[in-house]
């Protein structure tokens, strides 16, 4: 009887410790924040190919969206630490209507924007996707031709 109680207690402890662990998409080279996991991918892709890659990477993933300055600064620091190419990085903001009405691919509210100087400009009426600018330490954004190839930042829900 004593052994049964001991084994049962041991199993209960294991169960409780495992049930407290959240399954997430975060790996050692990812940034967990606000119920999301952010991961940089260095392989250059067009904006559309990058979004499709994120969606296939794990359920609930998209190119990253930003909603506060503090969040943007943490992500910029993460990219600076883990991004090998030191080049621009796609995020999930685009202008589908081509009328400066920017939308996130995850359909979250466009409540925060952080454009670089004189941006967005839709240069030559061809720039409708958004990248983080490396020369700003990944703090500021630029609209870019969607067919350009950049590294990209995915975000996944825990």
Curated annotation (Swiss-Prot):
Disulfide bonds: 26-37, 54-154, 61-156, 129-146
Other known facts: Met-33 has been shown to be oxidized to methionine sulfoxide but this probably results from sample treatment prior to mass spectrometry.
Record text on subunit structure and interactions: Homodimer; disulfide-linked.
Organs and tissues of expression: Expressed by the venom gland.
Protein family (similarity comment): Belongs to the true venom lectin family.
Signal peptide residue numbers: 1-23
Intervals of motif Galactose-binding: 119-121
GO molecular function ontology, one term from the record: carbohydrate binding
Protein name according to UniProt: C-type lectin TsL
Task performed by this protein: Galactose-binding protein which recognizes specific carbohydrate structures and agglutinates a variety of animal cells by binding to cell-surface glycoproteins and glycolipids. May be a calcium-dependent lectin.
Glycan-bearing residues: 28
Record bears the keyword Metal-binding: yes
Subcellular locations according to the entry: Secreted
PANTHER family linked: MANNOSE, PHOSPHOLIPASE, LECTIN RECEPTOR RELATED
Lineage of producing organism: Eukaryota, Metazoa, Chordata, Craniata, Vertebrata
Primary residence: secreted
Species for this entry: Trimeresurus stejnegeri (Chinese green tree viper)
Residue intervals of the C-type lectin domain: 24-158
Highest taxon in the source lineage: Eukaryota
UniProt-annotated binding residues for Ca(2+): 119, 121, 127, 142-143
GO cellular component entries: extracellular region
Keywords (A to Z) from UniProt: Calcium, Disulfide bond, Glycoprotein, Lectin, Metal-binding, Secreted, Signal
InterPro entries: C-type_lectin-like (IPR001304), C-type_lectin-like/link_sf (IPR016186), C-type_lectin/snaclec_domain (IPR050111), C-type_lectin_CS (IPR018378), CTDL_fold (IPR016187)
């Amino acid at each position: 009887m004593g052994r049964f109680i001991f084994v049962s207690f041991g199993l209960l402890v294991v169960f409780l410790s495992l049930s407290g662990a959240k399954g997430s998409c975060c790996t050692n080279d990812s940034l967990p924040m606000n119920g999301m996991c952010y991961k940089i991918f260095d392989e250059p892709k067009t904006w559309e190919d990058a979004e499709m890659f994120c969606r296939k990477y794990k359920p609930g993933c998209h190119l990253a969206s930003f909603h506060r300055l503090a969040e943007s600064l943490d992500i910029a620091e993460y990219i600076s630490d883990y991004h090998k190419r030191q080049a621009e990085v796609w995020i999930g903001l685009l202008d589908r209507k081509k009328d400066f009405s920017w939308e996130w691919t995850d359909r979250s509210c466009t409540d925060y924007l952080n454009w670089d100087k004189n941006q967005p400009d839709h240069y030559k009426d061809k720039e409708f996707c958004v990248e983080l600018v490396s020369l700003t330490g990944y703090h500021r954004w630029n609209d870019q031709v969607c067919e350009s190839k950049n590294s990209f930042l995915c975000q996944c829900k825990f």
